[in-house]
């Protein structure tokens, strides 16, 4: 007996409100669902195509589609003869151990290049590939990751698979091995390798400064090799800190490309593309699970935060469809029903997550104006508490997804705004 599929009521195989990153190798979240951003897409591709080596940065608020844009750019570049892979390389800046060193970041870049070589040329062989395999295997074994066989990757973890590579070998040999792998790539007819560095979304200010130091530490060793094209992705403040703090790094990076939210028409097209791709019965039309007014209102509340908007649609519609019995087709969910469901749900979740004090302060903010921008000085006056208490509460609200800090403007005070998730609770 098949399990019930609530989305089948709209002739859809599964939820169209997924948040998974679009990938070239995925049948459920394929890249052809990407919409909009043609200008930004062309700018990134032109920079890659106009140089033997490039370093770019894509910035913007959380949830507006930065990662998906870069995944699409990598796929575009691949059709033009560049090598890449769907993997995203994280920049880690926390801790005083291996993960907080330039050597670790160098190892991640080397692993990314090696993965791209194997992804595009599974039969790759030769001294350059063997040297890369040995270093990458050593890196992954020390980090508790995967081992590498002569024919690719495996999930083994035994000591017999280990390679005796001294910890300092990465700093000594890594840059040479990286350069040789890139030369091998060019020798195989590729125009270069495009790597996607991510994980700047949630870096604290201190972590972003540390990441800037790490990037500076490998500038000459790794960033400037012919054939290597890097795209760093993260929030506006994090990206600016990471790539513009040090002159040595800023001088070799293009100015960050700061993304604005997708327009409403593009968001509506994005949803239509998903409905069509998930059509269950090709002999019958699909139906939108929500009325147009729902999309318009949530777009206004979330101000272009697609991640938050899709989650709100998923949560609200799933709750409402759970009350629907299988049978005849159901009408799209209306605005009033969805907003009421999300208000009750978000209120309960935030109250439980925040506790009484932080919830009461968020409520006081909402009673003044849930859409208003606030500074810490304004919140000191509103909440009638001292600045350290305001700072602590804001951190709690940010971690709960109720508030976000807007990008800095020079030396002006940081501005804070309620997220769509919090505004739905009021």
Predicted features along the sequence, with ranges:
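Short, cationic-aromatic polyanion-contact patches
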Residues: 408-426
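A short, basic N-terminal segment
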Residues: 1-56, 76-79
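Conserved AAA+ ATPase small/helical "lid" subdomain
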Residues: 130-138, 275-329
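Winged-helix-like regulatory helical subdomains adjacent to P-loop NTPase cores
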Residues: 304, 308-378
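Short amphipathic alpha-helical interaction segments
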Residues: 384-400, 413
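The catalytic "switch" region of P-loop NTPases
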Residues: 2-12, 176, 180-295
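P-loop NTPase nucleotide-binding core
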Residues: 46-193, 197, 203-206, 228, ...
């Amino acid at each position: 007996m098949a399990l019930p599929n609530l989305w089948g009521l709209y002739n859809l195989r599964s939820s169209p409100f997924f948040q998974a990153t679009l990938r070239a190798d995925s049948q459920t979240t394929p890249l052809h669902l990407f919409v909009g951003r043609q200008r930004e897409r062309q700018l990134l591709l032109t920079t890659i195509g106009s140089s033997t080596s490039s370093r770019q940065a894509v910035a913007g608020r959380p949830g507006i589609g930065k990662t998906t844009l870069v995944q699409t750019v990598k796929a575009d570049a691949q059709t033009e003869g560049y090598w890449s892979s769907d993997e995203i390389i994280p920049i880690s800046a926390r801790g005083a151990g291996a993960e907080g060193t330039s050597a670790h970041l160098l190892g991640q870049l080397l692993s990314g290049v090696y993965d791209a070589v194997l992804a595009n040329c599974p039969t790759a062989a030769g001294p350059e590939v063997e040297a890369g395999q040995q270093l990458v295997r050593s890196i992954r074994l020390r980090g508790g990751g995967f081992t590498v066989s002569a024919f690719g990757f495996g999930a083994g973890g035994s000591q017999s698979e280990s390679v005796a590579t001294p910890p300092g070998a990465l700093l000594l040999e890594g840059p040479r091995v990286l350069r040789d792998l890139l030369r091998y790539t060019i020798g195989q007819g590729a125009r270069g390798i495009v790597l996607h560095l991510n994980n700047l979304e949630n870096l604290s200010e201190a972590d972003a400064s540390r990441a800037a130091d790490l990037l500076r530490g490998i500038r000459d060793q790794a960033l400037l090799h012919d054939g290597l094209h890097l795209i760093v992705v993260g929030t506006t403040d994090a990206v600016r800190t990471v790539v513009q703090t040090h002159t040595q790094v800023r001088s070799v990076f293009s100015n960050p490309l700061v993304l604005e939210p997708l327009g409403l028409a593009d968001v509506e097209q994005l949803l239509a593309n998903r409905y069509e791709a998930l059509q269950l019965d090709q002999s019958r039309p699909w139906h939108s699970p929500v009325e147009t007014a729902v999309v318009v209102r949530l777009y206004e509340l979330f101000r272009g935060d697609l991640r938050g908007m899709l989650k709100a649609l998923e949560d609200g519609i799933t709750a409402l469809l759970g009350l629907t019995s299988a049978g005849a087709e159901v009408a799209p969910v209306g605005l009033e029903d969805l907003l009421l469901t999300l208000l009750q749900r978000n209120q309960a979740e935030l109250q439980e997550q925040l506790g009484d004090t932080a919830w009461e302060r968020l409520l006081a903010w909402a009673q003044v104006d849930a859409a208003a921008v606030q500074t810490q000085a304004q919140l000191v006056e509103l909440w009638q508490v001292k600045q350290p208490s305001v700072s602590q509460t804001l951190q709690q609200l940010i971690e709960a997804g109720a508030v976000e800090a807007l990008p800095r403007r020079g030396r002006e005070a940081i501005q804070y705004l309620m997220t769509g998730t919090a505004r739905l609770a009021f």
